[in-house]
Amino acid sequence: MTDSLDNARQQARAWLAANVPSGPPPEEGPASRAFVLAWQKRQAESGWAGVSWPREFGGRGASVLEQIIWFEEYARAGAPSPLDASFVGLNHAGPTLIACGTAAQKAFHLPRILNGEALWCQGFSEPGAGSDLASIKTRGRLEGDTLVVDGHKIWSSYADIADYQELLVRTDPQAKSSRALTWIICPMETPGLTVRPIKTMAGPHKYCEIFYDAVRIPLSNVVGGLNNGWPTAMSTLAFERGTASVALMIGLIRKVEQLLAACPADRAAMRARLAGLRAQGASIRAMAYRVALESADTVPDASGSLVRLGFSEFVQEVAAVAIDLFGLDAPQVLRSHGLGYEYLDAFSETIAGGTSEIQRNIIAERLLGLPRGPR
């Protein structure tokens, strides 16, 4: 490691040691919103917000290696999950605006995302269109200088506490597939928009469904142009290297190590199973590093699906082993190790963000060059 990278690590470690909030964050509602915004503001005030964003837009402009170092130290310091309610704004909406937004859109929204003044959610998936976004039905009808939106979105994380939504709608019913979509900025307080939290067995609600009944959005909120929503949404890939997954992997590996330490010495088979998981986690982390570094100067390719598939299934395996280890005492012990929610939510990991089946198709077709399967 070079002196500059070592210095970056020491700076990150020192700042995190002095600033990471103590205790678990609130699980939902207004208290959760206030916590996320305050933590984001604290990072922004010290120049640690938006580490991957270009400096000209208020970010840190960190290299891929510097981003990896930041997220390594972030995880080791026990900082709040990078997948909290700030994730969509920092990793999806913000980068999309940087790539495709107008000067006015950038000037208004980017500082608010970075400085902890506004939260964003995503309005892509629908009850009949999750993995196949090109088939969405929510419609944006053009009326003068306004889009009138009617439809239904689902599985929108933190929509109940968000200020804005990156919304994908169908604006040309005659066009085929993705050529009919438009990416728009949707304020969550717009009349006609209703948010309903979805309760799951995991407890605190994270997911929501959203209903649109003649929601009127000005054309000035269109990003990337009418009927150009698909390439606009894909533009995020030019910034996203998956470096935030490093923090998630390190956090999960640490929990495996905690389970290993709690496993009695006479349970040799279970200890071997946990040791195998520890090695598996290390290999996925190494793969995440490699994918991030190889895409440093290019738009990331389908290699990210390797990391996504490995991580999502690793989460489920860790949760299953923890249950086997503690048996009837598992609910109480898992909570003490911070794994209670992870176990109950683990089943969604291989569905959200692209199912394992879709990730395997991407790997087969785009990386291995195998024939495309039937659709």
Regions found by a protein language model. Give the residues of each.
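Glycine-rich beta->alpha junctions and the first turn(s) of the following alpha-helix
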Residues: 3, 193-283, 349
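A short, Trp-centered hydrophobic/proline-enriched beta-strand micro-motif
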Residues: 116-124, 168
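A structural signal for short hydrophobic beta-strand segments in well-ordered beta-sheet cores
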Residues: 138-141
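Amphipathic, small/basic residue-rich leader segments at the start of a protein or domain
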Residues: 1-87, 108, 112-115, 268-277, ...
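Glycine-rich phosphate/cofactor-binding loops in nucleotide/flavin-utilizing enzymes
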Residues: 65, 69-73, 92, 232-235, ...
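N-terminal glycine-rich flavin-associated loop
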Residues: 82-104, 130, 146
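A short core secondary-structure module
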Residues: 146, 150-196
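C-terminal helix-coil-helix/basic helical segment that borders enzyme active sites and/or dimer interfaces
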Residues: 24-30, 264, 268-271, 282-337
